[in-house]
Amino acid sequence: KVFFIATANNLNTIPTPLLDRMELIEVEGYLTEEKKEIARRHLIPKEQKELDFGKYGTLKLTPAATELIIEKYTRESGVRQLEKQIDKIFRKTAYLTAVNNEMPFAKSTIKPQDIETLLGKPPYNRDKYQGNTYAGVVTGLAWTAVGGEILFIETSLSKSKASKLTLTGNLGDVMKESAVLALEYIKSHAEKLNLDYRIFDNWDIHIHVPEGATPKDGPSAGITIATSLASALTQRKVRANIAMTGEITLRGKVLPVGGIKEKILAAKRAGITDIVMSEENRKDIEEIKATYIDGLKFHFVDNVEEVFEIALLDEI
């Protein structure tokens, strides 16, 4: 009898017949603080042992420098890229020391301002909340193979004789279905939003999710799409610093979604202060350490009408 242990970053690439025969154990990605601790205890000491700077002493990285590498030079749930970047820093420093016959950094310590010299311009810019003054733009929370991310749902209207729904942004089938479902819900509850039903016959609706080169799918953007539609159709703007995640049903019920821990951290990184999610996700929040949710206000809802009440401002 042979026992196989396999690892994968993305289950979507595994053939279904093979996946059905596997026992799945999902391992959560590391938090930024956990990555910093792994770097401090393991990755940096490993490089220090391999590269001896002799009379110049032991090369060190400040915690702030390590965090900068994690945030702007890696995008992963693990620490593989982080290890490569730290290795690159040590090798580049060794080269500069050998060429110039002196340590290029004071007290053999690398600070945040030194990182760009060693690694070049940062390839990633961690998501930040984009305060907007436009109706129809809503911030959502997504979970990906590299951790939590924030995304923006944009809805615009254009005058037309024959109304149609256009979806762009490299959306998968499930996300497209969520958009259709959200629109149908709003149509059937137009009176509650003080909408003239004829608006659906005279205007084209365009829903877009930026960063079109990145594929997006899943049901968790349901309430975000519904709120974006409601905002655009009523011209009511969305509250500042609010994000949301949750699946929506045709009856307007908000269902729980996964990846809550990662989404919460993405929201906090982006400067979000208020998060809307399903009441059934309350238990997930209770399992997260208090330090990670400090400064965040959670709004737990059962139906999408509650989402509109929380997220949409009264003034136009």
Task: For the regions a language model picked out, list residue spans one by one.
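Peripheral, non-AAA+ core regions of ATP-driven protein-machinery
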Residues: 107, 125-130, 134-139, 147-316
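Conserved catalytic-core segments of large NTP-driven translation/proteostasis enzymes
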Residues: 62-157, 161-171
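AAA+/SF3 P-loop NTPase mechanochemical coupling elements
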Residues: 1-8, 57-62, 203
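Conserved beta-strand scaffold positions in the cores of enzyme catalytic domains, especially
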Residues: 4, 24, 298-300
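Short, polar loop motifs at secondary-structure junctions
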Residues: 9-12, 280-282
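Conserved C-terminal "switch" segment of AAA+ ATPases
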Residues: 10-20, 24-87, 92-107, 192-198, ...
